[in-house]
Amino acid sequence: MKKNKSLISFLGVFIMLFSFCFQGNVQADVNTVQSGKIKSGNVTVWEVGNVAKVLADVERLNLNTVNVPIQVDIPNVTSTNMVINQAQKQQAIILIQELLKRNIQVIVEPFPYIQQGNVGETEWNPSNINDFFWNWKTVILQDIFNSITSKYNVYGLKIASNFVNMEYAEGYWSDTIDFVRQQYKGNVLYQMNWWLTASWDPSYEAKFVEKINRPYLKKVDIVSIDSWFEVSEKRNPSYEEVKQSLFATTVYNRGQNVVQQLEQLHKATGKPVYFGGFNVPARELGLQNPWNPDVSNVFSKNVQLNGWRAYRDVLEPKPYFKGFSIWFIGSNDSTHAYQIHSQE
């Protein structure tokens, strides 16, 4: 017994020394990530300065990509005025530099920060669509071209983030993509918000069909989804129950076939499909309202684990599926529902 304790002590010291030697040179091991796939994490606009924690999460979660947001300050939900927060952008650039040093791919996302972050981006409904697109291109995207994409090897650029009230403007988006292509040679991503359909209401299906057949989606490289599908109403669904629910959701008996709809999206656009923001809160009912980290005050690691396992097992083998981005990484709040609480 004494010998074993000595051996354990020696190994512990060795591991600590080994870790110390490699501090500051975090290199994600991406060997388990399939070639051409993305295994990413999203950083929030207020945590881009947590460089050490972001790098630690990249290593812990074996990521090959990080989604770095650039804060776009917007005074209210109907505003067409917008400006990049330069102080936050400088922090983001430092993070980008550190990630690229470690061969971690970077996706840049101009992120709408409405009313000091008190209003979600899906609520943005500009009063003048022409002014919105002019400022989005010449004030926001142009700043990103000048200060980031022209200077750093950026893997991807999200040109939209859940703009549900602007996605109808097909000609404007087509023009925006052309504008982007003139100055940026990396991957152009359009990120749409998740959607609902219900077998008992055909109007939802009609909206979905309209959504996936927007002509401009064929002009981007990757179609990204902020993915918070309401899958299961059970407090603690098993792995098999979650898996089955991806083909027929049980919340309000909607019967939404998420997997089939993702394939429809791919076929309509001809583009890979990517979950550009995804997680399952480690709470009971976490798969009923995954967009709500406070859906329940009862912690459940199994809900998160079963949710992730089911999604990965179903979607990762699909050739059209590009990968996941974890919402979120880089946070020092160890008890948050969106922290990944399992080693798997």
Predicted regions and their residues:
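Aromatic-lined carbohydrate-recognition surfaces of secreted/lumenal glycan-active proteins
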Residues: 108-112, 158-162, 168, 177-208, ...
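Short, acidic/polar
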Residues: 45-59, 133-148, 200-214, 308-314
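Substrate-binding cleft and catalytic face of glycoside hydrolase catalytic domains
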Residues: 61-79, 90-166, 280-287, 327-333
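Glycoside hydrolase catalytic-domain groove-lining segments
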Residues: 88-89, 109, 184-189, 213, ...
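Substrate-binding cleft/loops of secretory-pathway carbohydrate-active enzymes
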Residues: 176, 194-226, 230, 283-289, ...
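Aromatic-rich peripheral "rim/lid" segments of glycoside hydrolase catalytic domains that contact
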Residues: 286, 290-344
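Boundary/entry segment of secreted carbohydrate-active catalytic domains
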Residues: 28-63
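Sec-dependent signal peptide cleavage junction
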Residues: 18-30
